[in-house]
Amino acid sequence: MLKYVVTDIGKMCLYIWPYRVWSWRRLFIFRVLNVVSIAILFETPHRLALVPNVCLYTHMAIPLSTCLFCLCLCICIKYDITQTQANNQRNLSLLFSVFHLVFSTIALSIYCIYQILILVKH
């Protein structure tokens, strides 16, 4: 259990770091590819046994944070927030990171409770 938590905290950091480094287009492609990969995993549940460190909270956090990313991107387009406005871009990048961290924490808690319930049943 601890191994999975440590592994997925590492994954969470990997999902957060591009927010500060990448452009809007690269970041959008990155998020879309994440959602597509999760969708493929959900369509083939028998393969999940072959990927032991794919945790429930990762599956939950990525689509949720991607939806928020798309929402914030639409807000940026509506209010004409461009890349030249560096302060706004940094603030939004930080906001995306916080959203992802919050959803990951909530989903990690749900995952831990789920694992405890499985252990109690056995």
Curated annotation (Swiss-Prot):
Record keywords: Membrane, Transmembrane, Transmembrane helix
Where is the protein situated, by its record's location annotation? Membrane
The record's disulfide annotation reads: none
Spans traversing the lipid bilayer: 21-40, 57-77, 94-114
Membrane-related topology note:
Multi-pass membrane protein
Q: What are the record's GO terms for cellular component? A: membrane
Q: Other remarks on record?
A: Partially overlaps HMLALPHA1.
Q: What is the protein name stated in its UniProt record?
A: Putative uncharacterized protein YCL065W
Q: What is the lineage of its organism?
A: Eukaryota, Fungi, Dikarya, Ascomycota, Saccharomycotina
